[in-house]
Amino acid sequence: MRHFLTLNDFSKDEIEQMINLARKIKKEAKTREFKPYLKDQKLAMIFEKSSTRTRVSFDVGMHELGGYALFLSKNDIQIGRGEPIRDTARVISRMCDMAMLRVDKHETLEEFAKFSSVPVINGLSDKFHPVQLMADYLTMLEFSAGEKVAYVGDGNNMTHSWLMLASKLGLELRVATPKGYEVDAGILKMANENAKISGAKIFITNDIKEAVNGADVVTTDTWVSMGQEAEKEKRLKDFAGYCVDENLMSLAKKDAIFLHCLPAYRGYEVSEAVFERHADEIFSEAENRLHAQKGVMVWLDERRR
């Protein structure tokens, strides 16, 4: 049995297997051919953090695969009242076939997975957001984007997940963050170790122009994530100059695509003009959460038999 907590847990071949499954299932769905890959299976969705895309995509995805999803906020279950994670994991995994958690701390996810007897999926944690990166990579393939990726912004869970994806698949990744907001040193070390095997090129800088120059894909994320509201004023000041606008995009390749995991705050991390010019890519990326996650769930199910 396998869990889906971070892309660092998978080989290049395994990641590509999941992506190929996602492409196959998406093609079937476009013709309204919904095969019951997960017939009558139950997905427990545990949310410590609210979401639009994560909730809708997993709920709809499970339904289209022949199963159903159960939404559980932290206030709906005893986790919110102090029940140990290990106990919740053992109860839920006796009643459900799979669990997806969107949590504040990655350690919560690891503890749940340790005591779960069914596959556990990371729907988001403070360290990683791997399901989003599966959607991003699927979108890159669909738009025939090249392999040079520039990430501009906070060294957060999205950046860490890009480091894992790029280092596993052999992509070139350039990360530009303001000083004081760099990526986690331990995660960067893991990425560099992976790169020695895959041939990936990892470049870290504080210079956004250096990062974006000649890029095939430019991506960013919000400057103020959930739980960081108290830091908003300081962050807006520190990230000034890190907006992906038309001038910055002009440094990328002419056919470069722009990705954003959403929600986007126009005028901050991305300009209105760039967002609307690349809206098809961005909303295809959002839709691909549905398809990529189907691929992940089916892949996990196949490997517990």
Swiss-Prot record:
L-ornithine binds at N157, D221, S225, M226. Keywords: Arginine metabolism, Cytoplasm, Transferase. One of its GO terms (molecular function) is amino acid binding. It is found in: Cytoplasm. It catalyses: carbamoyl phosphate + L-ornithine = L-citrulline + phosphate + H(+). Its EC number is 2.1.3.3. GO terms for biological process: arginine biosynthetic process via ornithine; arginine catabolic process to ornithine; citrulline biosynthetic process. Pfam families: OTCace, OTCace_N. GO terms for cellular component: cytoplasm. InterPro entries: Asp/Orn_carbamoyltranf_P-bd, Asp/Orn_carbamoylTrfase, Asp/Orn_carbamoylTrfase_sf, Asp_carbamoyltransf_Asp/Orn-bd, Orn/put_carbamltrans, OTCase_ArgI. Carbamoyl phosphate binds at S51, T52, R53, T54, Q78, R102, H129, P130, V131, Q132, C261, L262, R289. Pathway: Amino-acid degradation; L-arginine degradation via ADI pathway; carbamoyl phosphate from L-arginine: step 2/2. It is an enzyme of class 2 (transferase). The keyword Iron does not apply. SUPFAM superfamilies: Aspartate/ornithine carbamoyltransferase. Belongs to the aspartate/ornithine carbamoyltransferase superfamily. OTCase family. Reversibly catalyzes the transfer of the carbamoyl group from carbamoyl phosphate (CP) to the N(epsilon) atom of ornithine (ORN) to produce L-citrulline. This is Ornithine carbamoyltransferase. The lineage of its organism: Bacteria, Pseudomonadati, Campylobacterota, Epsilonproteobacteria, Campylobacterales.
